[in-house]
Amino acid sequence: MEEAGKLQCIIDSNIYQQMKCGGCKNVIALHGSIYENTCPHCGKIYSMEYMRDSEKIPRCESCGTVIRPGVKLFGEMMNSTIMSEASSQVEQADVLLLLGTSVASEVYSKYLNHFEGRYLILIHKERQFLDERADLLILEEPRKVLEKLKF
């Protein structure tokens, strides 16, 4: 969809970067990424493999400080720059496509207030609360729908 010029941005709450790994370019990762971990003291970057392979709590090789995972943990403040960018992208969208999530989702519901476009399309497996807000509702696995559309 991105290559065809039909997709401007993906707003993702997943921390595993599946969209980026799949080749998508403009992805806003709301909750960060497990692939980008940082020492809060000296700023050195560490890979997910370094974190995974550490026998104990991962520490910075340079200064010994505990490495900070690149994801937002429950109770932490969201990055306001990322939230503003996501809101701006939703505001500019002509069509908003929600895949595998709900209009009532705590993560996405606040962004829907910024949507002034023409169509809200929901694709998920089962009926959910507030589905009636959608202009088009498709009750099927999102991956299957995108395959049928050749995306």
Regions found by a protein language model. Give the residues of each.
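Conserved catalytic alpha/beta core of Sir2/sirtuin-type deacylases, generalized to analogous enzyme cores
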Residues: 1-151
